[in-house]
Amino acid sequence: MDSYFKAAVSDLDKLLDDFEQNPDEQDYLQDVQNAYDSNHCSVSSELASSQRTSLLPKDQECVNSCASSETSYGTNESSLNEKTLKGLTSIQNEKNVTGLDLLSSVDGGTSDEIQPLYMGRCSKPICDLISDMGNLVHATNSEEDIKKLLPDDFKSNADSLIGLDLSSVSDTPCVSSTDHDSDTVREQQNDISSELQNREIGGIKELGIKVDTTLSDSYNYSGTENLKDKKIFNQLESIVDFNMSSALTRQSSKMFHAKDKLQHKSQPCGLLKDVGLVKEEVDVAVITAAECLKEEGKTSALTCSLPKNEDLCLNDSNSRDENFKLPDFSFQEDKTVIKQSAQEDSKSLDLKDNDVIQDSSSALHVSSKDVPSSLSCLPASGSMCGSLIESKARGDFLPQHEHKDNIQDAVTIHEEIQNSVVLGGEPFKENDLLKQEKCKSILLQSLIEGMEDRKIDPDQTVIRAESLDGGDTSSTVVESQEGLSGTHVPESSDCCEGFINTFSSNDMDGQDLDYFNIDEGAKSGPLISDAELDAFLTEQYLQTTNIKSFEENVNDSKSQMNQIDMKGLDDGNINNIYFNAEAGAIGESHGINIICEIVDKQNTIENGLSLGEKSTIPVQQGLPTSKSEITNQLSVSDINSQSVGGARPKQLFSLPSRTRSSKDLNKPDVPDTIESEPSTADTVVPITCAIDSTADPQVSFNSNYIDIESNSEGGSSFVTANEDSVPENTCKEGLVLGQKQPTWVPDSEAPNCMNCQVKFTFTKRRHHCRACGKVFCGVCCNRKCKLQYLEKEARVCVVCYETISKAQAFERMMSPTGSNLKSNHSDECTTVQPPQENQTSSIPSPATLPVSALKQPGVEGLCSKEQKRVWFADGILPNGEVADTTKLSSGSKRCSEDFSPLSPDVPMTVNTVDHSHSTTVEKPNNETGDITRNEIIQSPISQVPSVEKLSMNTGNEGLPTSGSFTLDDDVFAETEEPSSPTGVLVNSNLPIASISDYRLLCDINKYVCNKISLLPNDEDSLPPLLVASGEKGSVPVVEEHPSHEQIILLLEGESFHPVTFVLNANLLVNVKFIFYSSDKYWYFSTNGLHGLGQAEIIILLLCLPNEDTIPKDIFRLFITIYKDALKGKYIENLDNITFTESFLSSKDHGGFLFITPTFQKLDDLSLPSNPFLCGILIQKLEIPWAKVFPMRLMLRLGAEYKAYPAPLTSIRGRKPLFGEIGHTIMNLLVDLRNYQYTLHNIDQLLIHMEMGKSCIKIPRKKYSDVMKVLNSSNEHVISIGASFSTEADSHLVCIQNDGIYETQANSATGHPRKVTGASFVVFNGALKTSSGFLAKSSIVEDGLMVQITPETMNGLRLALREQKDFKITCGKVDAVDLREYVDICWVDAEEKGNKGVISSVDGISLQGFPSEKIKLEADFETDEKIVKCTEVFYFLKDQDLSILSTSYQFAKEIAMACSAALCPHLKTLKSNGMNKIGLRVSIDTDMVEFQAGSEGQLLPQHYLNDLDSALIPVIHGGTSNSSLPLEIELVFFIIEHLF
């Protein structure tokens, strides 16, 4: 035992030395994680693609890193396992030094089939130093020795091993890998491990390769379990048992980082879904997780699951000191791990299986101690598993009895956990768990039914933090954990996570959990007893007492940030929580974990400060509700340097569950490396973040990168490296990129794009980035940027472009105060602050904590609500002040349909108010494994649990303000961000006038996909629902898949409030029930068409009796209008849209006629901004009239429904008002068959008929239109269509009865008929002088017919050409007293257009000013945002309208120059509520000026400066070509680029 332990310590010391000497190479978290993944993934890399696919469902592929690694490592595992197994004594006969303790005993699992896949992942070794050491020793000494240690039957006893391995491995893999890298670096001498690493992790540095063979084996083993390869499992199991404990200990300690946990949370779902995805992406773990999340997209399960785990969370303020609370067992919701439903054949473990249960129980035991570490390990696979676990999971992992020696050692997990898993041999019963659910100890309720059915039901998985009772968590983590052998503990912790996860919601519902039974064989196997190990480590354990306080301090600071999540947790617990992922893990795992923790990158035993890169305080966003989830990730990696032989004393952590208050400190203390340099720590973080951001904004909880490097015995110190790392690294990378010529990657070494992995072909050519030298496809390398070494613009990839842009923006932001912060950033990122003893303040001093680019962990956590501000990317606040650089944050967008994470290829930087929601996402390059960039992602708006809950989301409640808006009362299907008490939109401080305010679209793109249509394809599903009160500071929330029943309940609620649907990121539709003219109508109104230059649309559709579903065809109509507007095809007054297929469940519905409301009643309608049109449903037989003579149809509708001039309502199933075309004068004037020609209509030309005279008023400005009519008509007939006259009190209406067209008059209600309008006039020059008439005038249908002689026709033509008035006298030649007169008058018609339109510059009315639409030849786009100039208004000053033709070209030039000047600022303008901008240009002989504003307020000066430099040259160049004076106003909209 002694020699064993010493050897382990010695190895650990060496590893630590290596880490300290080569921190860069070892990027702790990433490298380790990558290595771990690589070991387990590399082996599976080849198998992964095939096996993963076959073994796991698509969703599971997400489970990926675990699953894929599991699959692929199947082959490698078998070999590795054989070797390692040989080194390991049979579980039955011996206890490994690393002792599987609980984990080992768990290995009693009957088979990998029995054990759930998730469990497999979770079972990965946690980094048990001792275990690892043992493995190393065996590996290094000889395979034969190992073989000797293991009985023959050990191999056959794969089940037991499997159980252990699965639980420990799965958990450890992702997180552990990070820790393992450092810890097991040396241990991993086995060729197999190196192979695995090499395969899987190209990007991972040597650290990954160094991962203990045992770790890789155990990791692989987990994979094998998933693979269903019993043989492999058996072999691995033995190996794992031995290795796992040690590996697990280390891994668990490191992996326990919040980051890892976060990853697991978000990953679980994603992982389950895409096991395959992980295979290549150890480095890209984040991406994988994100992808998984995407696939799971809709499954909020991860997040939801996490909350339950929170319930389960170990936070037990009471047990804090004495008991190890399962670190964030809430995290373990991920562990809920799937007990992959028993259904899953090979992968799902039989929950009932004693062996499996044993594993889980052991895992639980271990986790109780090792929870932090094991959790950290779990994050990659275990947590993922937990997230993945579907509440559906039929198979529940029933912890088997693990009452064996190991169990005794196991520390009792919180009572809650105990309820579910009773260490000390008591069976876990689900009923107990249910009871304890209240205590927060409830594990994720849902287990994944089957590995194949990896999708987690978001609703099912959702666990509410509220349900957690802080007090209940008091259940003590069994102190006996110390008793558990360190190795066993780590393994157990992993297993525990998995097993805890195994408790499915179903189990919670009351199914009894099987006892976690530890295999006797497994117990007998260990070389060193738990008691011996505990005794040996006791002194060291005592040394970690300071760690607790340190962690508490950290937790306090973090807790402020996460108080929202903490809602259900006790404040005391929060304080008690240890954030040391490593130290925490270590404490739980005892000596082993400590050792692992020691491995932490900067762990300096000498100082007694183990600078655990992992000491990061992970704020697990998995579930905002999962308070315990906040894994006490701050690792108390500061295990006393006093530890003997370099081993860190194990320390019990009473980890009160608490909301993850800080970002995942996934990143190592090492400053972020330049994009070309792989940063394992960074990679790990990205994995967690990606998953988090993808599946849950909450996951993207990492608001602060706080590395609490170590909390040494003497005191605790915070390492701030990670916090600034994002902005700082970005800045550094941006500064470095382009300074010198990069190394050119040869074409031969890049068969695929190094960003999107697309294969290069003859047509898809290679492009080298001039900034980084890598090879990309044309899509990924389509940017241009000025590089210093070239002194000119050159082609760069999208990643370098973003990095350089961010660096430039960051520098611009640096003010006198900002620059100081900047310098502090770098210092804090790389240095460990001196330990501060007895630091009890819950708010760490600024010097102690890293200055987060996202937020300051201390004060802002408390005052997040008051501190929320909006600022521009370049650091300017809306009021012109300089923004504090420490608050720089960004927003993330998520797809409403696929919940996909940000594309690794498309960096998004968005200013957001909510620091606590940001997550750091790094993009590892699939080919090189290098992290090409760091990204801070924040999603201020997410979905809210339920409409009823909406109001509460804005309060200081533990529930995230933004989570998926589940109309369901109780469920927060997906809480994306456990954010500050009030998740505020970026533009929250901008007053939103109403649901029709165009500014409401400013942030929609952050919550939905950039798809042109978000309408589901099926008939029943509805588009995403946006719920917003329209009040200042209100928090919009999005429900991805609302149901008709829920919508009806909302619509029929009090006051008939409208609901808003998101048809795409640029178009909203408000729906409401209204009573109009005593009937009930569906009222639809759009918001967003103005951005394309299209008038908004309203539709009033009569409700059918007992109609309880929204007519979705209306949404399709709006999408059609939107697409037409994109093409420049606009709908205006009296235009139409027709259908060729059934519409609104009837083939008789022909389309819509659109009119501009005039005399109609609009008082009770929530109208959109002007201009807008009203759509009226028409029948198929009415289509000809809508096309050739729409005014006739409009007026006929008015006569039918007693409305003047027309109704605004649409009635389904009505009889058509016109039948087959009969004998009508229109047959002579228009083509009613093929629509080849129609009646020439002159806008604003009016025909007024009174007694004895008729007047045809022709606007002078329409002279050109009149000339067109004359030139196109024959010499005998002139026909002109008129406009509807608002000056007339009645109008002629044509009615068809039995094929005969008759004339009626329809008048406005309550007005006497004096002036009657007509729809057209026909001058017929065929009247013969011999007829005895001078001229004849008569009413024909709804128009005026004037018959004149040829001579009179010639005079009329001449008068029209010369723009002179003309009078026609009608009547008989001899009847002087009975004559009538027809006057043709040229009038200066008053401009009545643009009614209700106001200027964005200063708010003045634009009514009466002529305008015309502008169509630019090209769009100006940046960051997927387009600036569109839609219209120009002319402020004429006694000028002839003829100048408009020349002014239009000048206006286009101004529009292009302005668009180019605004382009760099589109994102900041839009995010700050300025998505509609007006530009007014005034030019005179001695004066040139312009004004730019939005919503009546001038733009900030720095925007005007850019406009000045762009516009002045254009204005001066255009003055000579335009008539002066000239004053115009251009309207610009900033919209999203949709696909």
Swiss-Prot record:
Tissue expression profile of the protein: Widely expressed. Highly expressed in kidney, placenta and lung. Expressed at intermediate level in heart, brain, skeletal muscle, spleen and liver. Weakly expressed in colon, thymus and peripheral blood lymphocytes.
GO biological process: endosomal transport; protein targeting to lysosome; regulation of endocytosis; signal transduction; vesicle organization
Residues annotated to bind Zn(2+) 2: C769, C772, C797, C800
Reported impact of C753S: Abolishes localization to endosomes and association with PI3P
Region (Disordered): 469-491, 640-678, 816-850, 884-907
Subcellular location: Cytoplasm; Early endosome membrane
Pfam families linked: FYVE, SARA_C
Modified residues (Phosphoserine): S123, S446, S815, S845, S896, S939, S946
Entry-linked InterPro entries: SARA-like_C (IPR022557), SARA/endofin (IPR035438), Znf_FYVE (IPR000306), Znf_FYVE-rel (IPR017455), Znf_FYVE_PHD (IPR011011), Znf_RING/FYVE/PHD (IPR013083)
GO CC field: cytosol; early endosome; early endosome membrane; intracellular membrane-bounded organelle
Topology relative to the membrane: Peripheral membrane protein
Start-end of Basic and acidic residues biased regions: 661-670
Keywords from the named record: Cytoplasm, Endosome, Membrane, Metal-binding, Phosphoprotein, Zinc, Zinc-finger
Complexes and interactors: Interacts (via C-terminus) with TOM1 (via C-terminus); interaction is required to target TOM1 to endosomes. Does not interact with TOM1L1 or TOM1L2.
Record remark: domains: The FYVE-type zinc finger is necessary and sufficient for its localization into early endosomes and mediates the association with PI3P.
Name assigned to this protein: Zinc finger FYVE domain-containing protein 16
